[in-house]
Amino acid sequence: MASKQLKLVIITGMSGAGKTVAMQSLEDLGYFCVDNLPPSLLPKFWELMKESDKMDKIALVMDLRGREFFDSIEPALDELDNTNFITTKILFLEADDKVLVSRYKETRRHHPLEPNGSVLDGINAERELLSDLKGRSQLVINTSNMAPRELRERINNEFQTEDKDIFNVQLMSFGFKYGIPIDADLVFDVRFLPNPHYIDKMRPLTGLDEDVYEYVMKWPETQTFLDKLVDLLMFTLPFYKREGKTQLVIAIGCTGGQHRSVALTEFVGKTIQQKYETTISHRDMKRRKGR
């Protein structure tokens, strides 16, 4: 009998969110992939894989196409958690409702939960049914603003470096007027800070411009907030990592996502970057006309 540690990635999530693309990406990374395996067969499947000397990385797509999915997925995952030769990671893919509806319209497909009814009703039912599974997932990716190529790149970045024990912190600025990022783990509101938008010469600029950055940073309340925020993050990040998270999405928001949130996201990101693998993005900065 082979004595080795097997790696299992379970790909699940919303219908239309990109599970097929994720499976193909993992297949390219050397994973043996199985689509639509019934959850009740999962423990038996892994006993067979344990005997194989050729396969040590497996990816399974598991979703509501399997009729017994919702009844048997949780017990199957609990059993896997108690199996010492398997390291399990759940990859959950989701997207905003309007994006999923648009994708269904483009493909002219019916939602599997509402084959004769409203696509949106099916999406809402599926989202509710999957809420517990999403909560126990180690990696959640929102594909609303991703092309298939971008999702492949994201999967590659996550799983190519998996053996290096990478923990990625994503710092994102955003504007509350455009909605809170759906994939954010932590959200911080900086609308209490003085707003450069009301200074004519700064209005067309962003927090990446030196004048705006210095204006936002000069206030005592800004410095006090940053000291407390960085202290909080440096305290909590090791514990998020200990719980098995491979990424943590931190969103910092102001009104329009142009000035205050951009400046603070840059500062916090560059500070966190000194200790953790960090990516910085500004979701709404390009929404302004002419940029």
UniProtKB/Swiss-Prot annotation:
Q: Which InterPro entries match?
A: P-loop_NTPase, RapZ-like, RapZ-like_N, RapZ_C
Which Pfam families does the UniProt entry name for this protein? PapZ_C, RapZ-like_N
UniProt function note: Displays ATPase and GTPase activities.
Keyword ATP-binding present in the record's keywords: the answer is yes
Q: From which organism does this entry originate?
A: Listeria monocytogenes serovar 1/2a (strain ATCC BAA-679 / EGD-e)
- Indicate the family of this protein: Belongs to the RapZ-like family.
* Residues binding ATP: 13-20
Protein name stated in the entry: Nucleotide-binding protein lmo2474
Q: Which residues bind GTP?
A: 63-66
Q: Which UniProt keywords apply?
A: ATP-binding, GTP-binding, Nucleotide-binding
* Molecular function (Gene Ontology), one example: ATP binding
Task: State the superkingdom.
Answer: Bacteria
